[in-house]
Amino acid sequence: IDSPITALTVFREELFIFAEERIYKLAGNTVADFVLQPVTREIGCKNGFTVQEFAGDIVFLGPDGLRSVAATERIGDVELGTISLPVQERFEGIVDPDEFDSLVIPDKTQYRIFFTNRSERNQAQTKGIICVRKGDSYEFSETKGIQPSSTDYLISSGTTYVLHGGYDGYVYRQEQGNDFDGSTIVGRYRSPDIVAGDAGIR
């Protein structure tokens, strides 16, 4: 491998090897027929903690945003392989690739990526992105106030646990309760515009 390795993950009986500037896959059944094949030599993964199996594909953080392995392999390094174009401005200005963590919630078909700037003292201003697969497209929303040092997801005895560890030494559970770490959750709802027979009337 001619680039520093950032992550290894198994997907559909193939080992995907993510490096900083390349992506390869190791395919085969025995030592005699293992073959190292390039997925792309133009795009790599800067942070191994962003590599997740999501919605029947592998999603990772490339130099130009979130990408899927299938699109990257099919169309190379062109912009069409980037799935995060609608929220691309959220990734701009973050120069340290280590400032990310992620997790997947399969029963919600959600990929969550957090911008974990350790030097940011105001945790309430720390943001993240939720990516949801809907049909053949992706929808996005923004999180605020979560600054994880690590993340995990598990199902135990039929109960779903979405967890993250904070830099304050505590382990937090997401998707539970009706407040945010003791604070009231501010929510806004907007219904679809009602045409009322005239598109000029709202």
Predicted feature locations:
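Beta-sheet repeat architectures centered on beta-propellers
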Residues: 3, 10, 36-57, 63-202
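Active-site periphery "cap/insert" segments of enzyme catalytic domains
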Residues: 4-18
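Surface-exposed extracellular loop regions of Gram-negative outer-membrane beta-barrel proteins
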Residues: 15-40
